[in-house]
Regions:
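Conserved Switch II/interswitch segment of TRAFAC-class P-loop GTPases
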Residues: 179-182, 203-220, 244-248
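A conserved segment at the C-terminal end of the G1
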Residues: 304-314
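Helix-rich effector regions associated with P-loop NTPase G domains
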Residues: 21, 28-88, 110-113, 150-161, ...
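Beta-strand/loop nucleic-acid-binding surfaces
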Residues: 135-152
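Conserved beta-strand/loop subsegment of P-loop NTPase cores
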Residues: 203-210, 233-241, 265-270
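Conserved glycine(s) of the Walker
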Residues: 301
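Canonical P-loop GTPase G-domain recognition
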Residues: 246-298
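Structural detector for short beta-strands of small beta-barrel domains
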Residues: 112-123
Length: 430
């Protein structure tokens, strides 16, 4: 124990002094100090053990020989093991895509081998492509190789219309061109300076799935999903699952907050796969010839909802941990499934734990149009709508023209976007 100035003592000498320098009044009993020190040491030991385990795993992976393309292909499911795979006719091709395909074929060698296709599934980097004549696995052409430094956003994604070459007598094809995307649902992920990842392309609507019955609905996640959907020109639909887990009062409270957050123009559907509630409403949001993407974190009930819409268990489902209601990843591939009857196609992707917003100003403006419109009358062009004089947005809030929950959410998202942009480029000042 070392006495510091005044009536405080400082504990140091641990593995990371800056993290464990604790200051408390001298009146604390000795047993309290011992408990605090023991807890700090245990936390440090746990961190060290976890870091060592991660380092050992990285070393093991570095020494193992990478799997060959043949080994990876052998590990993906065969077509005979898949159900509800969309046909080529389920995914319409627009005029711009067809014109781009014709132009590419006119310049390609052996154009008779080229086919117009749609990527309906992605397993371990191997797309499953549906064409007018067949459905088969394909690989990327050399021009798509990531080792050359291309952005991942250029790689074929689920929902892409592609020009694929398939030589006579070959089981696999080669994707040589990704045709223009009508819409593209992208997110930023990983790496120090970020990387764009296309989760699905050519989508018409996004089903924002959020579970009920686990405390308050995660409004921040719903808001981020709303911004991402509107940014890519897709129609957002909020789907609240597991309604059977909450009582009437909880449901009314959560519904009120969600409606306040998303505004009157966004549809909100309450569902329960166990009771069959709301399934027809969700199905009506995906008419024949359209494509919807289902978006939600692990444990939100995406796969369970899809199985209920399909009428049988096609996708694997998993439980959630009771202590924090967090789910485990059960969807490990990006897949499309065709709904039965007069309905369209739904794309499913692994649950996303984070939804960073970078460069989604257009989506933010579309999600909160009344705030953007009111901000045009603010005295200062860079008004943050928090403390500046002459803020027209706060005046509109006081007058009841802007919901306080929507304004608070808008401010949080705008601040998050500024921080994310500066992380990608420290020279950016917003």
């Amino acid at each position: 124990m070392k006495r510091a100035e005044g009536k405080y003592v400082s504990w140091s000498g641990f593995a990371r002094p800056a993290l464990f320098d604790l200051k408390y009044p001298l009146s604390c009993d000795l047993w309290c100090w011992e408990a605090l020190v023991g807890k700090a040491k245990a936390k440090a030991k746990k961190k060290t053990t976890g870091a060592r385990a991660k380092r050992d795993r990285r070393r093991k992976l570095a020494t193992e020989a990478p799997a060959s393309a043949e080994e990876l292909l052998a590990s993906v499911p065969g077509l005979d093991a898949l159900q509800d795979v969309p046909a080529f006719d389920d995914l319409p091709v627009d005029d711009a895509q067809r014109a781009a395909f014709d132009d590419f074929c006119a310049r390609a060698e052996e154009p008779e081998q080229m086919q117009l296709g749609a990527v309906v599934r992605l397993d371990r980097g191997f797309p499953l492509v549906a064409t007018a004549d067949d459905t088969f696995r394909a690989e990327h052409a050399v021009g798509f190789a990531k080792s050359r430094g291309e952005d991942e956003v250029l790689l074929p994604a689920v929902g892409d219309r592609v020009a694929v070459r398939r030589a006579p007598g070959h089981d696999m094809g080669v994707i040589e061109c990704v045709l223009p995307r009508r819409t593209s649902f992208e997110r930023w992920r990983g790496r120090a300076r970020g990387e764009r990842q296309v989760l699905c392309s050519n989508v018409d609507s996004v089903l924002i799935v959020q579970a009920l019955g686990a405390g308050e609905v995660l409004l921040d996640r719903v808001a981020r999903s709303l911004v991402l959907a509107l940014d890519c020109d897709a129609e957002p639909v909020v789907v609240l699952t597991k309604a059977d887990r909450c009582d009437a009062d909880e449901l009314e409270r959560d519904l009120d907050r969600v409606h306040r957050l998303v505004g009157p123009d966004v549809r909100v559907i309450v569902t329960s796969s166990a009771e069959g509630r709301g399934l027809d409403e969700v199905r009506a949001c995906v008419p024949a010839g359209s494509c919807a993407m289902i978006l939600g974190e692990s444990g939100a009930g995406k796969s369970t909802l899809l199985n209920a819409l399909l009428g049988h268990d096609t996708l694997a489902t998993g439980g959630v941990r009771e202590r924090d209601d967090q789910g485990r990843h059960t969807t490990v591939a990006r897949v499309m499934v065709a709904l039965p009857g007069e309905a369209g196609v739904i794309a499913d992707a692994p649950g996303l734990r984070s939804l960073p917003l970078v460069g989604h100003e257009r989506g933010l403006a579309r999600a909160f149009p009344e705030i953007v419109e009111a901000s045009r009358a603010c005295r200062f062009g860079d008004c943050t709508h928090t403390h500046e004089p002459g803020c027209a947005v706060r005046e509109a809030e006081d007058a009841g023209q802007i919901d306080s929950l929507r304004l608070e959410t808008f401010q949080n998202l705008a601040s998050s976007m500024r921080v994310s942009a500066q992380m990608l480029d420290p020279d950016v000042h917003l």
